[in-house]
Amino acid sequence: MAHYLAQCYRAEGVPARIIDLRECPLPFCDGEAAYSHPTVLSLSKIISEARVIILATPIYNFDASSALKNLIELTGEAWNDKIVGFLCAAGGSLSYMSIMGLANSLMLDFRCLIIPRFVYATADDFEDFQLSSTGLRERIQRLAAASTRIRND
Protein backbone atom coordinates (compact mmCIF):
# COMPACT_ATOMS: atom_id res chain seq x y z
CA MET A 1 0.00 0.00 0.00
CA ALA A 2 2.80 2.42 0.86
CA HIS A 3 4.48 1.85 -2.49
CA TYR A 4 1.23 2.44 -4.36
CA LEU A 5 0.65 5.64 -2.36
CA ALA A 6 4.16 6.82 -3.30
CA GLN A 7 3.34 6.11 -6.96
CA CYS A 8 0.19 8.22 -6.63
CA TYR A 9 2.18 11.12 -5.21
CA ARG A 10 4.93 10.89 -7.81
CA ALA A 11 2.36 10.78 -10.63
CA GLU A 12 1.20 14.21 -9.41
CA GLY A 13 4.75 15.56 -9.04
CA VAL A 14 4.66 15.31 -5.24
CA PRO A 15 7.88 14.01 -3.69
CA ALA A 16 7.51 10.84 -1.64
CA ARG A 17 9.90 8.87 0.52
CA ILE A 18 9.28 5.47 2.07
CA ILE A 19 10.92 4.52 5.34
CA ASP A 20 10.63 0.83 6.12
CA LEU A 21 11.12 0.22 9.84
CA ARG A 22 12.23 -3.33 9.06
CA GLU A 23 15.35 -1.72 7.57
CA CYS A 24 15.92 0.73 10.44
CA PRO A 25 17.17 -0.98 13.58
CA LEU A 26 15.69 0.97 16.47
CA PRO A 27 16.33 0.42 20.16
CA PHE A 28 13.38 0.01 22.48
CA CYS A 29 12.39 3.30 24.05
CA ASP A 30 13.93 3.23 27.51
CA GLY A 31 13.42 6.87 28.44
CA GLU A 32 17.17 7.48 28.45
CA ALA A 33 19.99 6.33 26.16
CA ALA A 34 17.75 5.23 23.28
CA TYR A 35 17.09 8.84 22.27
CA SER A 36 20.71 9.36 21.22
CA HIS A 37 20.87 6.23 19.04
CA PRO A 38 22.09 7.20 15.52
CA THR A 39 19.02 5.76 13.78
CA VAL A 40 16.72 7.62 16.16
CA LEU A 41 18.53 10.88 15.46
CA SER A 42 18.38 10.29 11.72
CA LEU A 43 14.66 9.45 11.73
CA SER A 44 13.90 12.38 14.05
CA LYS A 45 15.47 14.71 11.50
CA ILE A 46 13.54 13.17 8.61
CA ILE A 47 10.25 13.39 10.50
CA SER A 48 10.84 16.95 11.68
CA GLU A 49 11.55 18.07 8.10
CA ALA A 50 8.47 16.36 6.65
CA ARG A 51 5.22 18.22 6.25
CA VAL A 52 2.97 15.19 5.63
CA ILE A 53 3.54 11.72 7.05
CA ILE A 54 1.44 8.75 6.05
CA LEU A 55 1.86 5.86 8.45
CA ALA A 56 1.45 2.39 6.96
CA THR A 57 0.95 -0.17 9.69
CA PRO A 58 -0.42 -3.61 10.27
CA ILE A 59 -3.11 -3.87 12.91
CA TYR A 60 -2.45 -6.38 15.68
CA ASN A 61 -4.70 -6.89 18.70
CA PHE A 62 -6.78 -3.82 17.80
CA ASP A 63 -3.76 -1.48 17.62
CA ALA A 64 -0.96 -0.24 15.39
CA SER A 65 2.28 -2.19 15.39
CA SER A 66 4.59 -1.90 18.38
CA ALA A 67 7.42 -0.92 16.01
CA LEU A 68 5.45 2.15 14.91
CA LYS A 69 4.51 3.11 18.46
CA ASN A 70 8.17 2.71 19.48
CA LEU A 71 9.22 5.03 16.63
CA ILE A 72 6.79 7.69 17.80
CA GLU A 73 7.99 7.38 21.41
CA LEU A 74 11.62 7.69 20.30
CA THR A 75 11.14 10.63 17.97
CA GLY A 76 8.60 12.55 20.09
CA GLU A 77 8.69 16.24 19.37
CA ALA A 78 9.68 15.70 15.74
CA TRP A 79 5.96 14.98 15.24
CA ASN A 80 4.84 18.47 16.31
CA ASP A 81 2.30 20.00 13.93
CA LYS A 82 2.57 17.31 11.23
CA ILE A 83 -0.19 16.35 8.83
CA VAL A 84 -0.68 12.61 9.40
CA GLY A 85 -2.62 9.96 7.52
CA PHE A 86 -2.96 6.21 7.89
CA LEU A 87 -2.74 3.10 5.74
CA CYS A 88 -3.83 0.14 7.87
CA ALA A 89 -3.76 -3.55 7.01
CA ALA A 90 -5.59 -6.10 9.12
CA GLY A 91 -6.70 -9.67 8.84
CA GLY A 92 -10.39 -8.82 9.05
CA SER A 93 -12.83 -5.95 8.94
CA LEU A 94 -13.71 -5.65 12.63
CA SER A 95 -10.72 -3.51 13.69
CA TYR A 96 -11.43 -0.56 11.41
CA MET A 97 -11.58 1.85 14.39
CA SER A 98 -8.37 0.53 15.93
CA ILE A 99 -6.13 3.34 14.67
CA MET A 100 -8.10 5.97 16.61
CA GLY A 101 -6.04 5.56 19.79
CA LEU A 102 -2.83 6.37 17.93
CA ALA A 103 -4.51 9.14 15.94
CA ASN A 104 -5.81 10.73 19.15
CA SER A 105 -2.38 10.48 20.77
CA LEU A 106 -0.70 12.20 17.83
CA MET A 107 -3.38 14.86 17.78
CA LEU A 108 -3.29 15.57 21.51
CA ASP A 109 0.40 15.04 22.30
CA PHE A 110 1.92 16.63 19.20
CA ARG A 111 -0.92 18.74 17.74
CA CYS A 112 -0.86 16.74 14.52
CA LEU A 113 -3.58 17.36 11.97
CA ILE A 114 -5.09 13.95 11.26
CA ILE A 115 -6.37 13.40 7.72
CA PRO A 116 -9.88 12.02 8.24
CA ARG A 117 -9.57 9.59 5.33
CA PHE A 118 -7.99 6.47 6.78
CA VAL A 119 -7.31 3.57 4.44
CA TYR A 120 -8.14 0.25 6.04
CA ALA A 121 -7.44 -2.93 4.10
CA THR A 122 -8.14 -6.56 4.87
CA ALA A 123 -6.78 -9.82 3.54
CA ASP A 124 -9.51 -9.73 0.88
CA ASP A 125 -7.80 -6.71 -0.72
CA PHE A 126 -4.63 -8.65 -1.55
CA GLU A 127 -3.64 -11.61 -3.67
CA ASP A 128 -0.14 -13.08 -3.40
CA PHE A 129 0.87 -10.08 -1.24
CA GLN A 130 -0.08 -7.64 -4.02
CA LEU A 131 -2.91 -5.11 -4.12
CA SER A 132 -5.76 -6.76 -5.97
CA SER A 133 -8.69 -4.56 -4.99
CA THR A 134 -9.75 -1.70 -7.22
CA GLY A 135 -11.60 -0.23 -4.25
CA LEU A 136 -8.43 -0.22 -2.16
CA ARG A 137 -6.48 1.49 -4.94
CA GLU A 138 -9.20 4.14 -5.17
CA ARG A 139 -9.12 4.71 -1.39
CA ILE A 140 -5.34 5.14 -1.51
CA GLN A 141 -5.69 7.60 -4.40
CA ARG A 142 -8.23 9.60 -2.38
CA LEU A 143 -5.85 9.67 0.61
CA ALA A 144 -3.06 10.95 -1.65
CA ALA A 145 -5.34 13.66 -3.04
CA ALA A 146 -6.64 14.68 0.40
CA SER A 147 -3.18 14.88 1.94
CA THR A 148 -1.87 16.91 -0.99
CA ARG A 149 -4.82 19.30 -0.79
CA ILE A 150 -4.43 19.77 2.97
CA ARG A 151 -0.66 20.22 2.61
CA ASN A 152 -1.13 22.93 0.00
CA ASP A 153 -3.85 24.87 1.87
Regions found by a protein language model. Give the residues of each.
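N-terminal beta1-alpha1 ligand-phosphate binding loop
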Residues: 1-13
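Glycine-rich phosphate/pyrophosphate-binding loop and the adjoining helix
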Residues: 35, 42, 113-153
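Alpha-helical scaffold elements within enzyme catalytic domains, especially in hydrolases
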Residues: 7-8, 45-46, 146
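Helix-loop-strand module that forms the ligand-binding subsite of alpha/beta enzymes
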Residues: 35-110
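N-terminal beta-loop-helix "entrance" segment that forms/cooperates
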Residues: 18-38, 126-129
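Alpha-helix C-cap/termination motif
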Residues: 11-12, 49, 78, 150
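Short beta-strand elements in bilobed, periplasmic/extracellular small-molecule ligand-binding domains
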Residues: 13-25, 112-121
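Hydrophobic alpha-helical membrane-association signature
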Residues: 1-2, 39, 98, 139, ...
